[in-house]
Curated annotation (Swiss-Prot):
Any GO molecular function: serine-type endopeptidase inhibitor activity
Keywords attached to this entry: Disulfide bond, Knottin, Protease inhibitor, Secreted, Serine protease inhibitor
Family, similarity comment: Belongs to the protease inhibitor I7 (squash-type serine protease inhibitor) family.
Site (Reactive bond): R6, I7
Major localisation: secreted
The name this protein goes by in its record: Trypsin inhibitor 6
CDD domains recorded: PlantTI
Functional note: Strongly inhibits trypsin, weakly inhibits chymotrypsin.
Signal peptide: none
Location(s), subcellular: Secreted
Coiled coil regions, renumbered to chain: none
Positions of disulphide bridges: C4-C21, C11-C23, C17-C29
Gene Ontology CC terms: extracellular region
Organism: Cyclanthera pedata
């Protein structure tokens, strides 16, 4: 499993997100 803090963060690309979160299609990290 990826390490991804459960924090709602808007993003445009994966590098906008914390830890191993990825930028999902709805525009938020997950």
């Amino acid at each position: 499993a990826r390490i991804c803090p459960r924090i709602l963060m808007k993003c445009k690309k994966d590098s906008d997100c914390l830890a191993e979160c990825i930028c999902e299609e709805h525009g938020f990290c997950g």
